[in-house]
């Protein structure tokens, strides 16, 4: 399919349609409309975006072989398609995911700041599952994951179902999980209160209720005594007054759970726009330290590591140099790119 040709034909048809509606006789108006067409005000050129190639960080199986992960993680984190599918192969990890797992193994708090689609959730789910398998909380809850929206919690619930229940061999220690938000009815909430899962998914509003409602505080917060992990997804959403509320909530949770060594994890696609990544890391670490109430070093802010997928030669793209990975604003695309037409063969 020639996407550029489709775009050109579509614009041409719409332009012919709109211009046929009214016959413009005034020369000034016609001149203005011609200028609008020349500047492509109504139909600008299409934007092209390239999917980044993240550097490989090995596989879950290799991390199990190295002793960085519990052997059972090899069975959990696999590519699965249906309920009874044990998975055809183990998950492959990106470099930033491996770095996060290594930092978590040392017991440090950290923040992951990488792009959309980079697998940020695995950077806390894998370490949490590993810790539950190695050192389960005898009181029940080992980790609380907080989302700013229920839609994100729902998506993560499905991922946990896929990894932790689909095709898992019988006889192995099960890692339990549950969602506790305003979506659950009374019966479902009662079941969570009784089961006390290893991993609890919630939002910051419901977490406030867990700390203030007597029954929920007694059952769930009591079961989270000595809490190991607190993960805040989409960290950049907690700003201003809401950020202050969540910061106080984190401190109250730490005290209520009697967890002075609580390991805090934050994930975000966008948090700082420094000139360099080193400057961005400092700013992100400062914000995360304020939010979590625990020291997060700039070196514990993990970013993505990309690999070049194009010809690195000096003439590959004008304006791109090894020391400057981004094209200069004045650099025009090469002519061979502008004249490129994908093959229409299947």
Label each residue range with its predicted role.
Residues 183-200, 291, 325:
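Conserved motor-coupling elements within RecA-like helicase/translocase cores
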Residues 1-99, 175:
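Helicase-associated low-complexity/disordered flanking segments
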Residues 130-156, 169-173, 258-260:
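Conserved SF1/SF2 helicase motif Ia
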Residues 152-181, 281-296:
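Conserved helix-turn-beta segment of the N-terminal RecA-like "Helicase ATP-binding" lobe
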Residues 140-164, 205-209, 242, 269-275:
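Conserved Walker A/P-loop ATP-binding site and its immediately adjacent core
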Residues 102-110, 122-138, 251-252:
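Walker A/P-loop NTP-binding motif
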Residues 200, 204-209, 215-260:
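SF2 helicase catalytic motif II
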């Amino acid at each position: 399919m020639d996407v550029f040709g489709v775009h050109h034909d579509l614009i041409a048809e719409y332009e012919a349609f709109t211009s046929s509606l009214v016959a413009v006789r005034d020369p000034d108006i016609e001149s203005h409309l011609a200028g609008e067409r020349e500047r492509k005000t109504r139909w600008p050129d299409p934007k092209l975006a390239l999917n980044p190639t993240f550097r490989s960080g090995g596989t879950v199986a290799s991390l199990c072989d190295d002793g960085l992960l519990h052997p059972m993680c090899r069975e959990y984190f696999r590519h699965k398609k249906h309920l009874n599918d044990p998975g055809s192969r183990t998950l492959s990890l990106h470099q930033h995911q491996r770095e996060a797992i290594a930092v978590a193994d040392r017991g440090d708090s950290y923040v992951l700041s990488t792009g959309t689609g980079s697998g940020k959730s695995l950077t806390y789910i894998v370490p949490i599952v590993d810790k539950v398998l190695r050192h389960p909380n005898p009181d029940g809850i080992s980790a609380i994951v907080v989302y700013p929206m229920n839609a994100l919690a729902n998506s993560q619930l499905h991922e946990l179902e896929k990894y932790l229940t689909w095709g898992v061999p019988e006889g192995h220690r099960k890692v339990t999980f549950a969602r506790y938000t305003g979506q659950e009815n009374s019966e479902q909430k009662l079941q969570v209160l009784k089961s006390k899962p290893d991993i609890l998914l919630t939002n910051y509003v419901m977490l406030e209720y867990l700390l203030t409602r007597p029954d929920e505080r007694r059952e769930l917060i009591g079961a989270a005594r000595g809490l190991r992990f607190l993960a805040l997804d989409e960290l950049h959403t907690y700003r201003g007054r809401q950020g202050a509320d969540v910061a106080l909530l984190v401190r109250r949770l730490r005290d209520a759970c009697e967890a002075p060594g609580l390991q805090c994890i934050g994930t975000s696609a966008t948090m700082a726009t420094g000139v360099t990544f080193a400057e961005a890391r400092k700013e992100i670490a400062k914000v995360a330290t304020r939010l979590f109430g625990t020291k997060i070093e700039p070196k514990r802010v993990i970013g993505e590591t990309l690999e070049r997928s194009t010809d690195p030669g000096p003439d590959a793209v004008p304006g791109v140099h090894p020391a400057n990975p981004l094209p200069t604003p004045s650099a025009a695309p090469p002519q061979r790119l502008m004249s490129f037409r994908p093959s229409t063969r299947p």
